[in-house]
């Protein structure tokens, strides 16, 4: 079994009914599409650097003997896992998969809201982590903006629904 067939299996699970739908080769290779994905990749790299840097802070605090709340460890692990997932979605979307584009666009709008709401809870996170969450959110909102341009919405137009067939009931 090769890697691509494993990835296609993952796509079928993650993509649902649109797992096999890809955009036209012309739109996929369009320079505008390419520029958007270059920008998104760099923004995700920045996310990864910030997330990794943020992970270094509690590690250093812990090594120094300070108590680090479990919620900080969990949030950092979740942020790094989400960023990894977003990289996968961006890669598959760049290869033309509609489902990956739609997931990337959706999550780049939802994750910032969740991050900002949790960062606003008094005393939940230390100040350095609240700052990291705000940066994380702003970068994701930038990704959402790139994905919402007219060109990208045209390139990744929602596939038409299959016509519903009436089920005949035997009486």
PLM regions with names:
Residues 1-171:
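Topology signature of small-to-medium multi-pass alpha-helical membrane proteins
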């Amino acid at each position: 079994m090769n890697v691509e067939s494993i990835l296609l299996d993952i796509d079928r699970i993650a993509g649902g009914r649109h797992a096999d739908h890809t955009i036209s080769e012309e739109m996929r290779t369009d320079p505008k599409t390419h520029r958007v994905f270059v920008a998104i990749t760099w923004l995700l790299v920045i996310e990864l650097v910030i997330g990794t840097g943020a992970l270094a802070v509690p590690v250093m605090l812990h090594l120094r003997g300070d108590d680090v709340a479990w919620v900080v460890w969990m949030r950092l692990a979740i942020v790094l896992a989400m960023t990894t997932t977003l990289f996968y979605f961006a890669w598959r979307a760049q290869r033309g998969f509609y489902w990956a584009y739609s997931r990337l666009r959706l999550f780049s709008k939802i994750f910032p809201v969740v991050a900002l709401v949790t960062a606003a809870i008094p005393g939940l996170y230390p100040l350095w982590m609240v700052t990291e969450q705000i940066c994380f959110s702003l970068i994701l909102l930038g990704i959402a903006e790139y994905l919402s341009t007219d060109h990208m919405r045209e390139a990744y137009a929602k596939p038409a629904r299959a016509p519903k067939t009436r089920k005949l009931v035997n009486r």
